[in-house]
Amino acid sequence: MFHATTIVAVRKGGKVAVAGDGQVTFGQNTIIKKGARKIRRLYKDSVLAGFAGSVADAITLFEKFEGKLEEYHGNLQRAAVELAKDWRTDRILRRLEALLIVADKENLLIISGSGEVIEPDDGVAAIGSGGPYALAAARALVRHTSMEAEDIAREALAVAAEICVYTNDNIIVERL
């Protein structure tokens, strides 16, 4: 299975940024790609979405989520809840192994296959193998610096890449 990545999202000062590394790992010991894009712009470029987990599963979920965004006219929270319900109850979808971070100008959410839609209290979220490291770094930077959301996301991911062997420093950041 292809897995292992880090995605971090930061909301600060009316802006949101989502950063992802570029590494794709096969099994436990083989890097097969260094420059993968794990963040997408959805629904008329008004929503950012990043994934951690199986690439094929994530692409399926991106497509489903974009359909929900269209169905609910860009309402991120409603689309996220409906995706989580489908993901949890559908016999095929519930086998998908991935996590999503989605954000628009007002909301930042983590969506999981077990039906959770989580909005972080502090405007910072991270998923994937390096997620705990990126989350800690981003929280510290939000609390103790005047850095912008994009710079915090980039630096938090750089810290995770220094620690997590499944995360590289080929960082892509998208912002709204």
UniProtKB/Swiss-Prot annotation:
<keyword id="KW-0378">Hydrolase</keyword>
<dbReference type="GO" id="GO:0051603">
    <property type="term" value="P:proteolysis involved in protein catabolic process"/>
</dbReference>
<feature type="binding site">
    <location>
        <position position="161"/>
    </location>
    <ligand>
        <name>Na(+)</name>
    </ligand>
</feature>
<dbReference type="GO" id="GO:0005839">
    <property type="term" value="C:proteasome core complex"/>
</dbReference>
<dbReference type="InterPro" id="IPR001353">
    <property type="entry name" value="Proteasome_sua/b"/>
</dbReference>
<comment type="function">
    <text>Protease subunit of a proteasome-like degradation complex believed to be a general protein degrading machinery.</text>
</comment>
<dbReference type="Pfam" id="PF00227">
    <property type="entry name" value="Proteasome"/>
</dbReference>
<comment type="similarity">
    <text>Belongs to the peptidase T1B family. HslV subfamily.</text>
</comment>
<dbReference type="InterPro" id="IPR029055">
    <property type="entry name" value="Ntn_hydrolases_N"/>
</dbReference>
<dbReference type="InterPro" id="IPR023333">
    <property type="entry name" value="Proteasome_suB-type"/>
</dbReference>
<keyword id="KW-0963">Cytoplasm</keyword>
<protein>
    <recommendedName>
        <fullName>ATP-dependent protease subunit HslV</fullName>
        <ecNumber>3.4.25.2</ecNumber>
    </recommendedName>
</protein>
<dbReference type="GO" id="GO:0046872">
    <property type="term" value="F:metal ion binding"/>
</dbReference>
<keyword id="KW-0021">Allosteric enzyme</keyword>
<dbReference type="GO" id="GO:0004298">
    <property type="term" value="F:threonine-type endopeptidase activity"/>
</dbReference>
<keyword id="KW-0915">Sodium</keyword>
<feature type="binding site">
    <location>
        <position position="164"/>
    </location>
    <ligand>
        <name>Na(+)</name>
    </ligand>
</feature>
<comment type="subunit">
    <text>A double ring-shaped homohexamer of HslV is capped on each side by a ring-shaped HslU homohexamer. The assembly of the HslU/HslV complex is dependent on binding of ATP.</text>
</comment>
<dbReference type="GO" id="GO:0009376">
    <property type="term" value="C:HslUV protease complex"/>
</dbReference>
<keyword id="KW-0645">Protease</keyword>
<keyword id="KW-0888">Threonine protease</keyword>
<keyword id="KW-0479">Metal-binding</keyword>
<dbReference type="InterPro" id="IPR022281">
    <property type="entry name" value="ATP-dep_Prtase_HsIV_su"/>
</dbReference>
<feature type="binding site">
    <location>
        <position position="167"/>
    </location>
    <ligand>
        <name>Na(+)</name>
    </ligand>
</feature>
<feature type="active site">
    <location>
        <position position="5"/>
    </location>
</feature>
